[in-house]
UniProtKB/Swiss-Prot annotation:
Originating gene: cyoE
Organism: Aliivibrio salmonicida (strain LFI1238) (Vibrio salmonicida (strain LFI1238))
Pathway: Porphyrin-containing compound metabolism; heme O biosynthesis; heme O from protoheme: step 1/1
Function: Converts heme B (protoheme IX) to heme O by substitution of the vinyl group on carbon 2 of heme B porphyrin ring with a hydroxyethyl farnesyl side group.
The protein's Enzyme Commission number: 2.5.1.141
Annotated CDD domains: PT_UbiA_Cox10
Record's protein name: Protoheme IX farnesyltransferase
Length: 290
């Protein structure tokens, strides 16, 4: 039973988001003092709020999940976990997570994580995901909140650097999510979810992916120009963005779109991991600041 409750929180999604929290935290740490305890409380608070959102997503998406082969065996769908208990589980995690951020970090980070929660649960899960091709765009807002919370936990104020960080992760979410929608298109079709590749076609989705990767690259380089990043960041981001764009530029048609989209997806993970890692490396004494 414990394992089933853990599965409701979608640990993979939590881990991916915690990497982005680290990115925001490390970026802010270049200009503000930090402590290990603040990092731990921030990570734990964000993890609990994300876990709560994922549980609520499982509850409200149970009708959709039942139609897709990838999700039809989830605990809520099979009935192995009671919906009322799952909802209580989500509420407890939400309260503890936001409470930790409010008390141990600052109220601004708690407010921001709640804003992300509202976008994910109400605007994305309950509304746009089911009704609009722009659901991915709405979801990208909630996906870009964790790094911003990591940043605000340290600084307690918004800045141009914070805005660029938020924009960068919003832009990253789009091609990443469109790639997933392409290689899982049959599942989305069975569940009648209006993702871009289904509504507009795979070539239109490819065009959008290429544009978003290009704009992502510009914003990532803008963070070097206007933020507290060094030459290590510039080198890693330039290489990562070039590699990602090169993958998206490969020929793609009906015969290879699954393979192509999986390559775009995998490269997106490498790019964002490299981005987050280099921000941490630059905190080391031998890093070169600009």
């Amino acid at each position: 039973m414990f394992k089933e409750y853990v599965s409701l929180t979608k640990p993979g999604i939590i881990m991916g988001n915690l990497i982005s929290v680290l990115a925001g935290y490390f970026l802010a740490a270049k200009s503000e003092s930090i402590t290990l305890s603040l990092l731990v409380y921030t990570m734990l608070g964000v993890a609990l709020v994300i876990a709560s959102g994922c549980v609520v997503n499982n509850i409200f998406d149970r009708d959709i999940d039942a139609k897709m082969s990838r999700t039809r065996n989830r605990a809520i769908v099979t009935g192995s976990i009671n919906i009322e208990f799952a909802f209580l589980f989500a509420i407890i995690m939400l309260l503890i997570g936001t409470g930790l951020l409010y008390k141990m970090a600052n109220p601004l980070s708690a407010v921001m994580v709640l804003l992300g929660y509202v976008f994910y649960v109400f605007f994305y899960t309950m509304w746009y995901k089911r009704t609009s091709v722009y659901g991915t765009l709405v979801g990208s807002v909630s996906g870009a909140i964790p790094p911003l919370v990591g940043y605000l936990a340290v600084t307690n104020y918004l800045s141009l650097e914070a805005v660029l960080l938020f924009g960068l992760f919003c832009l990253w979410q789009m091609p990443h999510s469109y790639a997933i929608a392409m290689f899982r298109m049959k599942d989305y079709q069975q569940a009648n979810i209006p993702v871009l590749p289904l509504v507009k076609g795979i070539q239109k989705a490819r065009q959008h992916i290429m544009i978003y990767v290009l704009v992502f690259s510009v914003v990532a380089l803008g963070l070097y120009a206007f933020g507290h990043t060094g030459y290590e960041y510039l080198a890693v981001v330039a290489i990562s963005c070039y590699g990602w764009f090169k993958v998206t530029y490969r020929n793609m048609d009906e015969s290879n779109y699954v393979q192509w989209s999986k390559s775009v997806f995998k490269t997106s993970l490498l790019a964002i991991t490299a981005f987050s890692t280099v921000l941490g490396i630059e905190l080391l004494p031998f890093s070169i600041t600009f």
